[in-house]
């Protein structure tokens, strides 16, 4: 009798369990589609390069909010601080991986990204960096892509632009660059090679490194004594701001020409923007553009963060929108694994055309390098103005 009772009770419990299970509906394709893709990146949110990291994070968040508001593809964004340090970048990346990151915005600056790109390659997480421009970032890694130009392209394009605009036809050129920075070195090397080909005379070629990046009196004196009338600065904002200030104090007033790393110098805390008057640079983004989409982005960024967005911000904004386009075209859903998404993103980015703030008709080759046009800019009255 006890056995019968036990059997009956067991049957009742089994039926209750089955009823409970059947009351919970199975996930539907619609449920998967309405969930969010986890997208993350590492950036210098503190420290000397924070101007770039925060610009990228802020603009990426604007893009995520806009895309999420439209329905369809949804994103959950997370950034971790790497302080522009490769070792800290690895720790930041691992935090994002543990969080469940499915697609990546890579790292903002080149040195950290050269390290984290190796991790995303090994883990088969697709990465699209807005601003890590060194060739080593993507070299030998089929799932690492760039929204920015590579360093070699910036160097040769700068020399060609200077020649085409007649900026160095009758003047001598100086270069001040950072010899322990892959970004600065990569641009310098192709700039110098292009100058040799184009017949541009470099009369002063001086360098600096970490730990020796606050006093530029020797470099400035060398350029000044050799009669350089145009100084090329393939460096970031922090050293550029000091060079401009110290040159002015020394009474040295050449023309200055920089690249995308100097975009943002006007928003540096404590920097006298009058020192940057007349500075020229190449960048894919013009915040002064009357283009409707650009103007709307600039206004929204200013309203939210109180400053004009730089090229790093625009590239990050484009990254998120490019991801949205690629994910939608691939029919991807957030329940897919990072590896499966990686395969689909490689297929999409090597075949699609993308229009964004930093260019129209953008395409990527199999090495992850983007094709788009650079724009000449000059700083006038504390604002960026297009030269072209």
Protein language model regions, located:
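Positively charged n-region of N-terminal signal peptides that target proteins for export
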Residues: 1-9
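C-terminal motif of bacterial Sec signal peptides marking the signal peptidase cleavage site
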Residues: 16-20
């Amino acid at each position: 009798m006890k056995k019968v009772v036990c059997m009956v009770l067991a049957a009742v419990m089994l039926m209750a369990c089955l009823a409970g299970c059947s009351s919970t509906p199975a996930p539907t394709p619609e449920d998967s589609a309405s969930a969010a893709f986890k997208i993350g990146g590492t950036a210098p949110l503190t420290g000397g390069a924070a101007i770039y990291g925060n610009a990228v994070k802020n603009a990426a968040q604007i893009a995520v909010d806009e895309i999420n508001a439209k329905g369809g593809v949804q994103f959950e964004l997370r950034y971790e601080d790497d302080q522009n340090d490769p070792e800290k970048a690895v720790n930041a990346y691992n935090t994002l991986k543990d969080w469940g990151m499915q697609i990546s915005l890579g790292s903002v600056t080149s040195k950290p990204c050269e390290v984290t790109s190796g991790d995303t390659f090994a883990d088969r997480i697709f990465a699209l960096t807005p601003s890590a421009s060194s060739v080593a970032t993507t070299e030998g890694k089929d799932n690492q892509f760039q929204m920015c130009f590579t360093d070699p392209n910036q160097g040769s394009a700068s020399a060609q632009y200077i020649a085409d605009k007649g900026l160095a036809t009758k003047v001598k050129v100086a270069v001040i660059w950072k010899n322990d920075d892959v970004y600065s070195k990569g641009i310098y090397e192709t700039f110098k090679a292009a100058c040799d080909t184009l017949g541009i005379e470099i009369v002063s070629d001086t360098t600096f490194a970490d730990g020796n990046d606050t006093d530029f009196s020797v470099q400035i004196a060398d350029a000044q004594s050799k009669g350089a009338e145009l100084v090329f600065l393939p460096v970031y904002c922090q050293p550029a701001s000091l060079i401009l200030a110290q040159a002015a104090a020394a009474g040295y007033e050449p023309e200055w020409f920089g690249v995308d790393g100097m975009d943002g110098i006007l928003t540096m805390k404590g920097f006298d923007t009058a020192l940057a008057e007349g500075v020229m640079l190449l960048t894919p983004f013009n915040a002064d553009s009357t283009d409707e989409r650009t103007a709307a982005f600039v206004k929204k960024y200013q309203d939210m963060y109180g400053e004009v967005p730089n090229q790093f911000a625009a590239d990050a904004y484009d990254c998120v929108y490019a991801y949205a386009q690629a994910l939608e075209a691939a029919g991807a859903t957030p329940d897919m694994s990072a590896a499966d998404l990686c395969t689909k993103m490689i297929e999409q980015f090597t075949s699609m055309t993308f229009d964004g703030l930093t260019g129209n008709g953008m395409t990527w080759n199999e090495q992850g390098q983007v094709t788009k046009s650079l724009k000449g800019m000059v700083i006038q009255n504390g604002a960026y103005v297009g030269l072209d």
